[in-house]
Amino acid sequence: MAMKSVSTLAVFAILFLVIVEMPEIKAQGSKCLKEYGGNVGFSYCAPRIFPSFCYRNCRKNKGAKGGRCRSGGAGAGSMICLCDYCSDKP
């Protein structure tokens, strides 16, 4: 009986240490996506141009694998270019 208690205690101790030592899972986007340079405007991210100027300039000027555009919030043509250092997906 004492051996079973010690074994159970050892298993729980090991499980606790494994859980405590696991690295935190952080949002991948924070490491991968960096802003190119403020409000770049709609023409920089125009959907008819492929790949976009955002994608091309992130690769050429920032050494990123690609670039993505996001809406910059309220306002007509408010767009933000995010350089992607993890994926080349436009």
From Swiss-Prot:
The gene is ATTI2. Belongs to the DEFL family. Protease inhibitor I18 (RTI/MTI-2) subfamily. This is Defensin-like protein 193. Its main location: secreted. Gene3D superfamilies: Knottin, scorpion toxin-like. Disulfide bonds join 32-86, 45-69, 54-81, 58-83. The keyword Disulfide bond applies. Residues 1-27 form the signal peptide. It is found in: Secreted. GO terms for cellular component: extracellular region. One of its GO terms (biological process) is defense response to fungus. The keyword Signal applies. The record marks 48-49 as: Reactive bond. Keywords: Antimicrobial, Disulfide bond, Fungicide, Plant defense, Secreted, Signal. One of its GO terms (molecular function) is sodium channel inhibitor activity.
